[in-house]
């Protein structure tokens, strides 16, 4: 199961975390930001989880292309490829636009994220071994 448990931290405090009741639980990172809209969305459906897993693999491939090395998260790729057992098995739900409302200009999250990265995160832009995406100049 991918279930919510209250357990004791290394310091003896009770903490809420999600547990995979198989060998994956000992190798994945501890859960953080479990109430973030994107984390909630990921747990809503197997299709959501699978979309995010595919996106993770694409990001790792892009990192390898740009920097010529393998990102540390790549070690977890196959472990995270299969969704937890108790996710609801229904169609993909609408992805949230998890950003300040000033950047939300559409019902389409892709449009909103493009707007957010063009206008709210331009200080982060570097295009190592790549040209900027076409939508960046539109």
Label each PLM-derived region with a short phrase.
Residues 15-66, 72-73:
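Amphipathic alpha-helical packing elements
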Residues 69, 76-83:
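Primarily interfacial, aromatic-capped hydrophobic alpha-helices that serve as membrane anchors
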